[in-house]
Amino acid sequence: MFQSDLFPAGEQLPSMPLAYAIGTRVAALLASGRHLTRTDISGLFADKTGVMDWGSAWTIDDYNNAVEIGALLWLRESSRIGLATSIHEAEARFDWLEAALPPRHVRSEAQVELQQFSTPPMLAWLMAKAAAVCAQDTLLEPSAGNGALALWGCLQNA
């Protein structure tokens, strides 16, 4: 089962974390074929919190997590990418995803201090493909991230 603090299992948490709530909306917009801008994502936060700019109701960490969670949810639910997908086909879909999301050049001081940098989605996929992850495997997500490495194991029921 794929689970982390930002991908709750069942009814474990009393409320949905803000970054996950926004991430689900990002994934739905991606699934509809939409490309998103920073303003679009800030607008999603504004819809949820009433505040358009980060700083009080939401943080740059929330923003980065929401975008990453949205991408991971889209990869899991809508991308049609699996470990059997050809490199060329997967690359085209990963390229679309990268073009559909705004670049994330801003990191919080805590992220920089702790050297928290996201695993690029295609790199995580390539690692799982090279490892030939299968249902008999047990995977551990070694990072403090949102599960980019564990996602592909989840799709293989590992």
Task: Please report, for each region that a protein language model flagged, where it lies by residue.
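Class I S-adenosyl-L-methionine
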Residues: 7-157
